[in-house]
């Protein structure tokens, strides 16, 4: 049960981006939602595995910079979304480019990398943990994308601004949490 709650917590940043993407592109197709959610799920699943195998060797270095990298990427994506709010269209080609999605997936999965490092100190089946984390993230992102699409229809261009603000706030939360700890 603890793994499920951990998986939900790790997925929240990806869920926020999925909801924002659904809101900013009201004609997002089921296949796009699947691809985006799958990519977020894959990153959330593999980052703990990478962290697990990095273990103690690089713990000081990784824990020192991961927050700054995540903040910078989320700030960039958030500002970009806010700028794009002036150009919103119902027939959105949506910068759901692989590059942009991978940046978002990477930034939101850095905390999963850190969790993977902590897994290396515990007796845990990393394969099962990674599968559960990835699956939970995937399912929640699919749901959030559809919810975002409904919100996008109601809010129109304001949804893109809201999505950008959410990304910036997530980045700020990451950096503040790092500075407090």
Curated annotation (Swiss-Prot):
Keyword field: Cell inner membrane, Cell membrane, Ion transport, Manganese, Membrane, Transmembrane, Transmembrane helix, Transport
Localization in the cell: Cell inner membrane
Molecular functions per Gene Ontology: manganese ion transmembrane transporter activity
GO cellular component terms attached to this protein's record: plasma membrane
Record membrane topology: Multi-pass membrane protein
InterPro entries assigned to the protein according to its UniProt record, in alphabetical order: Mntp/YtaF, Put_MntP
Stored Pfam families: Mntp (PF02659)
Spans traversing the lipid bilayer: 3-23, 42-62, 63-83, 101-121, 124-144, 160-180
Family classification: Belongs to the MntP (TC 9.B.29) family.
Protein task: Probably functions as a manganese efflux pump.
Protein name: Putative manganese efflux pump MntP
Name of the gene: mntP
